[in-house]
């Protein structure tokens, strides 16, 4: 099973449909949620791939022996007429709130929940055992209230945006090892490649989920 938390394209144009054509040539299920750079055209192109599992709503879907749930990002930022760049945090959090409600109502709880923006994961903390996100172009992993949140870096190296900074954006992916019966995270490998023009490659293995992070305490006064 391959999991992709979105932003498969830069501008979400129909010309970029071919970016997802390679998905159909893989011989494993490909679970995907829409990112804020992915348009409805891109989502439709992904749905046309025979092995794609497009998650965009409250339904629990089974793939590769795992129960999955996910929701696409509420924004489409390349179209500046939408003013989605200025969308308030509540719009992003609402994605997770809808998933949290569906999670609570599901008879068979999903073992893996996908969102694009880590902010959308907040309402899922304390519910789902494992939540995967993207968007930040930076790898972050933490456990809070029993939920492990894994934010993936840029598996595609951020496209042409990788050239905007002095150093190229590294290519990052994570291989998860899940219990065959429970779907619980047992270990994971973090792979990092140097990015455009950089031949550096690193891999590190982590055993078990990361240590729990205490929930912030309310301030007094």
Question: Which stretches of residues belong to each language-model region?
Answer:
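Actinobacteria-biased recognition of intrinsically disordered, low-complexity terminal regions
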Residues: 202-221
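His/acidic metal-ligating clusters that form di-metal
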Residues: 64-148
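Conserved hydrophobic/aromatic beta-strand scaffold that supports enzyme active sites
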Residues: 60, 68-70, 173-175
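Residues that act as N-cap/strand-start positions at coil-to-secondary-structure junctions
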Residues: 54-55, 107-109, 170
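Conserved beta-sheet core of the metallophosphoesterase superfamily
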Residues: 22-32, 38, 48, 112-203, ...
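Extracytoplasmic/secreted envelope proteins and their assembly/folding machinery
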Residues: 16-20, 96, 173
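General small-molecule cofactor/ligand-binding pocket signal
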Residues: 53-55, 69, 150
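Core catalytic region of metal-dependent phosphoesterases/phosphodiesterases
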Residues: 1-62
